């Protein structure tokens, strides 16, 4: 009988997993693991795995390091981390980047947001390229009626003008120089190449002629709008291509007699591709994608089971979670290792919590990760001097049994996993904790606490995948895999109220098994900017036909028969004026994308935009080739009735007994079973432990385990939702609640971003969501905009005091007035009370978002020249936007549109429709927060929830007191002093006096200048925000940011100074300018770092509505340079301190607004020199294509960002208007820091933002 060998291999960082199936005269199926790196025995782990399988198949020993005969092998499928590791370790090819002139630093600036709000060093991934060439070319968008010569139509149907043809000669010389310097890899991304790829294709021809071997064009890889992620994708592909190709070529050399399509690799999108077509950009998530395919194909109870499943893959350093509901969920833009890329990939959420995650006692709270012990030294029990980890906690609690692990630990890799060292280290930690909390905790209680915190941490991304989309978690199965997942499965399911857990027999190698079940795929994509309606449908269908033929032809050329190939059609749709796209699959029997899109949008966001056109952004074809000898799924039951009709075996004899610790019942002597010894249809009642050669399954009390042929099914035996009324208030409980409160805030933010319409909220992320105590004190917030986080507390407290005793369930409040805790008028705050049994307010949920326009004297409501608050738009102290459950749209319209227009020279909101939609989005976010709080109260009881809330605030208070006491000692108990001056000369003065015994501190702003006849007056809430931000940044630890941070602080602000202005004062600049200057002064007083750019560089442009049409407004805050510190250089081109909003992608700007972005790059040498230099500012240069109002609101234009400790000052910013009313003699006008101009068509504005100050004297 002819033999057929199929092999699937997942090469991970530590272990390589192998699944194989041998058919024919020697039938065999099996799995094994081997070390990914073991140079003493083999050069390449996958090749070694294949050699071992061939030994099994032939019954003969095959020597190592000789080519292997693959005659009997029909399939080798691999997932690999080669590209991932090269990216993480920065071991790719020397690469150059070609981009349109004026944008050389675009990728470095990115979206200008910093990864960690409170990291003053602003650590960002460094660029992957070594050189940049600016191609002399420019293509700009036009409308079809433009009379300008040279109009062409792009692939999307958009009209463009080739303003400047590519200078081929100059480019040739630049590329030739690169080639002579040893470059062989280039990436290319030119403006609007997603629709006009011709210039990129010319670059490719020139580069090939010179001899470059790796050329990645953004227009070919991901022809989608947004140049930044498209460019990053091209750069990654170019950077990794050579490394990946070297590995693939080396791998192929290990074999001979290889049939076509034998060796295939997993792509990030969950499809397989032949080794010769495997690309770097598709390889980044190869391993995790294989795991998702594995659980998707093995998590059905029976063939007709439609229950969606959550995949839970717990590894050593992190945990991956994903969802499958009968179809794979893809995303097309993602943040990978801090890099935003465009590439189809499975939607996999990762959290830095795994078996190797380290355990910490910090600020009287338990903390798990994100630091990891890694493969070496690994957990303490590995006997290589490692720290305590989640694995060690499981060992201590009896959930991992060392006797069932091989003796591969210790310096000589010949010892057993060691529990004694774990007991010793936990005992040391116990002594520290018990002293701090003044209670007696056992090492088991402490270890269990860390496990509970780890479990709660791992639940957060699962809730994000489901509850934030409005999906019911309890309606899912949990599919658990990965080496560490089995020890946490029951606890995770209980936390999520999931009743069934599915664990495949190959769960510890499910990524490898998933490869065996995957299909070969090929995708084709085409940009297609069309309105989705009956008139355009024939054109859209014809484009689909072109892609369909192309995709099918590709697979046929690979050797697949037409009968093996099927196709799936997708349209990437969005509402007009909205950048949120949804990839919608074509219905089987119709072309009704519209209905599916509207239903999907409403299901996910809670509403639809009835009056908006639906736009087709791009179309995509996914062609799937199914192998004839491959099974589709691997279900738990052979039939739908197997579980109900089966008599299960209950009297199984355990292998041994072992003590296991559980939170509910303490230590229990548990049965231990070996999975291989359990007959099919065995029933194991928890608590128990089931061990296998590659995994350990913990069956907790109230769970049972049913053994099937290829699965273990864990089932909850009683309701998961139990009111935990007897929970003690201890650090474990508080840490768990800190995670739950944070999760609520995060989900509120996700709902707000998804349901909002405006660019400000949805794209720039200019919003914040938070949870507040019954009296309005901050409890928890997601990491949104710092200027909002501390100030929202003031707003919620004002509303609480104003409405005390007068609110009823269903009431929701709206406010933006500075006197009521607002900061500036475009920031609307929605406050939702949460009631206990419709009686008492037990929490508040609040959301704040920056509206595009709320009226006033200029479009965008950010006037540079306002002198009174009414000029800045609608001012609302309090308003019941929802009264007893009824949304008052008429009242809201009156406040936003009618009232502001009553004042001289003022308009009502120019974007009323978007504003109302965004308010509804904030209502949706608060509704989500309220429902989650109510659920939490039902689960635990109100008493423990609120006591935990206050306990977490107390922990934050202690952390701040400890830091302040340390500063007092460091400064010899002297007051900390600083003074700085606004650009108009107004002083901003601070003295901080700290009590060295208690940590109490007075922040006294006596000496600060009076209210100004301008708009940079700062409502008092802004100072509170700045103080809380600085304290959290100085602490530099992951503590909860809440009201407790301000408990030790007394803030004294003189009456009538510009930090405490009158009710009618103009304040629009206080939030966006003065907040940054307050922050600089505080950090200066504490001698933390040099000044950052001290500004948000607020640029607004737009025009009023005419003839019944809405007006237009666009608002940006622009990055600058960060200040240097005692151990770090300042980062260039980044938002600092009190803001972290994103900047709109250049291509999106030019699509949406009648402007051309001429330059967006770093302002070289604008950072202050020093031992550590300040970061550079940026240059952002617009040309206006019609007359528009333009306002610039900025600081640091007359006073430079200071250096510290001998470091030099950063450069001041400059705002320049180029008046081109006479094109032959343009007029260059310095606008100063704050000004408003009516720009004519063809005029320009150039914003040069400040650099950061340097730190330390320059070495000579």
UniProtKB/Swiss-Prot annotation:
UniProt superkingdom: Eukaryota
GO terms of biological process kind: cellular detoxification; glutathione metabolic process
GO CC terms, sorted: cytosol
Family: Belongs to the oxoprolinase family.
One Pfam family matching this protein: Hydantoinase_A
PANTHER family reported for this sequence: 5-OXOPROLINASE (PTHR11365:SF2), 5-OXOPROLINASE RELATED (PTHR11365)
InterPro entries with a match to the protein in the record: Hydant_A_N, Hydantoinase_A, Hydantoinase_B, Oxoprolinase-like
Protein name per Swiss-Prot or TrEMBL: Uncharacterized protein C11D3.14c
Gene Ontology molecular function terms on file: 5-oxoprolinase (ATP-hydrolyzing) activity
Residue ranges that the Swiss-Prot or TrEMBL entry lists as coiled coil: none
């Amino acid at each position: 009988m002819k033999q057929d060998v199929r092999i699937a291999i997942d090469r991970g960082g530590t272990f390589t997993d192998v699944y194989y199936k041998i058919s024919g005269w020697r039938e065999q199926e099996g799995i094994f693991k081997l070390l990914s790196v073991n140079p003493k025995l083999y050069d390449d782990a996958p090749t070694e795995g294949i050699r071992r399988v061939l030994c099994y198949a032939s019954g003969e020993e095959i020597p190592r390091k000789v080519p292997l005969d693959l005659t009997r092998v029909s399939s080798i499928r691999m997932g690999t981390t080669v590209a991932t590791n090269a990216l993480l370790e920065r071991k790719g090819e020397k690469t150059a980047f070609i981009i349109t002139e004026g944008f050389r630093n675009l990728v470095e600036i990115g979206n200008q947001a910093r990864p960690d709000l409170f990291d003053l060093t602003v650590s960002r991934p460094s660029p992957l390229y070594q050189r940049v060439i600016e191609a002399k070319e420019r293509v700009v968008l036009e409308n079809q009626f433009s009379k300008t010569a040279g109009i062409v139509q792009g692939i999307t149907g958009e009209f463009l003008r080739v303003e400047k043809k590519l200078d081929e000669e100059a480019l040739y010389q630049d590329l030739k120089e690169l080639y002579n310097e040893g470059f062989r890899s280039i990436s290319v991304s030119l403006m609007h190449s997603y629709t006009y790829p011709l210039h990129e294709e010319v670059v490719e021809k020139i580069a090939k002629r010179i001899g470059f071997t790796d050329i990645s064009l953004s227009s070919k890889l991901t022809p989608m709008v947004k140049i930044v992620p498209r460019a990053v994708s091209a750069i990654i592909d170019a950077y990794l291509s050579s490394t990946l190709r070297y590995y693939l070529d080396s791998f192929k050399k290990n074999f001979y007699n290889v049939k076509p399509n034998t060796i295939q690799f997993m792509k990030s999108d969950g499809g397989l591709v032949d080794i010769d077509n495997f690309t770097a950009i598709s390889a980044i998530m190869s391993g995790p994608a294989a795991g998702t395919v594995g659980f998707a194909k093995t998590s059905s109870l029976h063939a007709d089971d439609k229950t969606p499943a959550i995949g839970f893959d717990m590894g050593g350093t992190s945990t991956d979670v994903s969802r499958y509901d009968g179809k794979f969920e893809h995303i097309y833009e993602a943040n990978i290792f801090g890099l935003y890329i465009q590439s189809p990939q499975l939607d996999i959420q990762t959290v830095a919590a795994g078996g190797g995650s380290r355990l910490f006692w910090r600020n009287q709270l338990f903390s798990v990760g994100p630091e990891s012990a890694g493969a070496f030294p690994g957990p303490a029990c590995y006997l290589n001097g490692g720290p305590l980890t989640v694995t060690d906690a499981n060992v201590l609690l009896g959930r991992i049994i060392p006797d069932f692990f091989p003796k591969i630990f210790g310096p000589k890799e010949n010892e057993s996993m060691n529990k004694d060292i774990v007991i010793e280290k936990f005992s040391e930690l116990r002594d520290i904790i018990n002293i701090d909390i003044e209670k007696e905790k056992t090492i088991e209680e402490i270890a269990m606490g860390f496990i509970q915190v780890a479990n709660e941490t791992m639940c957060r991304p699962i809730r994000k995948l489901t509850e934030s989309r409005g999906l019911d978690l309890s309606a899912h199965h949990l599919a658990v895999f990965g080496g560490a997942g089995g020890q946490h499965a029951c606890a995770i399911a209980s936390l999520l109220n999931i009743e069934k857990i599915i664990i495949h027999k190959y769960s510890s190698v499910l990524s490898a098994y998933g490869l065996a079940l995957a299909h070969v795929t090929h995708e084709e994509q085409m940009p297609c900017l069309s309105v989705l309606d009956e008139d355009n449908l024939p054109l859209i269908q014809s484009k689909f036909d072109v892609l369909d033929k192309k995709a099918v032809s590709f697979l046929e050329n690979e050797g697949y028969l037409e009968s093996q190939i099927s196709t799936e059609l997708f349209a990437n749709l969005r509402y007009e004026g909205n950048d949120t796209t949804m990839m919608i699959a074509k219905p089987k029997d119709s072309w009704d994308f519209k209905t599916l899109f509207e239903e999907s949008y409403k299901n996910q966001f809670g509403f639809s935009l009835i009056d908006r056109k639906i736009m087709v952004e791009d179309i995509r074809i996914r062609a799937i080739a199914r192998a004839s000898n491959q099974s589709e799924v691997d279900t738990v039951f052979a039939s739908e009735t197997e579980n109900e009709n089966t008599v299960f075996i209950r009297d199984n004899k355990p292998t041994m007994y072992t003590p296991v610790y559980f939170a509910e019942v303490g230590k229990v002597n548990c049965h231990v079973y070996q999975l291989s010894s359990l007959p099919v249809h065995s029933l194991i009642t928890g608590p128990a432990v089931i061990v296998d050669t590659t995994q350990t399954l913990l069956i907790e009390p109230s769970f049972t385990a049913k053994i099937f042929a290829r699965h273990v099914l864990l089932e909850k035996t009683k309701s998961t939702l139990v009111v935990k009324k007897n929970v003690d208030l201890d650090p474990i409980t508080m840490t768990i609640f800190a995670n739950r409160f944070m999760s609520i805030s995060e989900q509120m933010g996700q709902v707000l971003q998804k349901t909002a319409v405006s660019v400000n909220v949805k794209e720039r992320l200019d919003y914040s969501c938070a949870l507040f105590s019954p009296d309005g004190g901050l409890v928890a917030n997601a990491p949104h905009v710092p200027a909002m986080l501390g100030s929202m507390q003031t707003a919620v407290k004002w509303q609480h005091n104003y409405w005390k005793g007068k609110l009823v369930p269903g009431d929701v409040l709206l406010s933006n007035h500075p006197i009521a805790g607002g900061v500036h008028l475009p920031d609307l705050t929605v406050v939702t009370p949460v009631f206990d049994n419709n009686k008492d307010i037990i929490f508040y949920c609040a959301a704040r978002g920056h509206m595009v326009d709320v009226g006033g004297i200029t479009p965008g409501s950010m006037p540079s020249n306002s002198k009174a608050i009414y000029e800045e738009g609608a001012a609302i102290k309090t308003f019941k936007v929802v009264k007893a459950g009824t949304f008052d749209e008429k009242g809201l319209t009156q406040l936003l549109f009618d009232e502001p227009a009553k004042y001289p020279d003022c308009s009502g909101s120019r974007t009323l429709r978007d504003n109302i939609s965004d308010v509804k989005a904030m209502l949706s976010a608060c509704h989500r927060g309220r429902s989650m709080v109510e659920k939490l109260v039902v689960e635990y009881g109100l008493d423990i929830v609120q006591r935990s809330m206050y306990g977490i605030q107390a922990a934050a208070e202690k952390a701040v007191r400890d830091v302040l006491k340390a500063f007092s000692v460091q400064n010899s108990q002297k007051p900390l002093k600083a003074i700085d001056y606004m650009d108009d000369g107004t002083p901003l003065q601070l003295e901080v006096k700290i009590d060295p015994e208690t940590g109490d501190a007075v922040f006294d702003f006596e000496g600060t200048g009076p209210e100004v006849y301008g708009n940079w007056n700062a409502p008092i809430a802004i100072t509170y925000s700045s103080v809380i931000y600085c304290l959290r940044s100085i602490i530099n630890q992951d503590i909860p940011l809440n009201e407790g941070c301000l408990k030790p602080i007394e803030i004294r602000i003189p009456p009538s100074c510009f930090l405490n202005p009158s009710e009618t004062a103009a304040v629009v600049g206080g939030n966006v300018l003065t907040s940054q200057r307050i922050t600089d002064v505080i950090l200066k007083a504490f001698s933390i770092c040099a000044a950052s750019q001290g500004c948000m560089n607020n640029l607004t442009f737009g025009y009023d509505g005419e003839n019944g049409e809405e007006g237009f407004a666009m608002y940006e805050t622009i990055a600058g340079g960060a200040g240097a510190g005692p151990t770090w250089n300042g980062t260039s081109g980044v938002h600092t301190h009190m803001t972290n909003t994103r900047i709109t992608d250049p291509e999106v700007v030019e699509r949406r607004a009648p402007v051309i972005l001429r330059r967006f790059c770093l302002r070289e040498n604008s950072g202050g020199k020093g031992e550590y230099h300040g970061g550079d500012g940026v240059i952002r240069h617009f040309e206006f294509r019609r007359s528009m109002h333009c306002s610039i609101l900025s600081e640091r234009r007359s006073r430079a960002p200071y250096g510290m400790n001998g470091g030099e000052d950063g450069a001041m910013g400059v705002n320049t208007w180029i008046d081109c009313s006479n094109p032959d003699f343009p007029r260059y006008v310095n606008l100063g820091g704050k000004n408003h101009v009516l720009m004519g068509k063809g005029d320009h504005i150039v914003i040069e933002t400040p650099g950061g100050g340097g730190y330390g004297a320059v070495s000579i």
